[in-house]
Amino acid sequence: MLNTLLVVGFGGFIGAILRMLSINLVNKFFPYSISFGTLFVNVLGSFIIGLLFSYAQNKGLSPLLKSFISTGFLGAFTTFSTFSYQNLLLLQSGNYLHFALNIILNVFLCLFAAWLGFLIFK
């Protein structure tokens, strides 16, 4: 159990740092009211989790590595709370078009990315 806690914590440490760097970098190039940085990490994380579980189903993966990547790294790299807060701000500002677009893009692109990732090792 201690090993699992340590690998999840280490994965979270790496994921949180990469999330911050990725969001800042993407938003620097796409400075719009929709946070494309958040969209980027959520889509990429969805793709990676699709890859991970497809690979694990077909080829096997150690429980520690699976915990490191899924719960640790991806748990910290992707962010639903930030997505929710950004949508709240869009609603409060009356920017309903960007509010709807942000939700649609995040939900459908993340689902599509997870499906694509899963197909790779199927």
Curated annotation (Swiss-Prot):
The keyword Transmembrane helix applies. PANTHER family: FLUORIDE EXPORT PROTEIN 1-RELATED. It is found in: Cell inner membrane. The chain crosses the membrane at residues 6-26, 33-53, 60-80, 101-121. This is Fluoride-specific ion channel FluC. It comes from Campylobacter jejuni subsp. jejuni serotype O:2 (strain ATCC 700819 / NCTC 11168). The gene is fluC. Na(+) is not transported, but it plays an essential structural role and its presence is essential for fluoride channel function. One of its GO terms (molecular function) is metal ion binding. It is a multi-pass membrane protein.
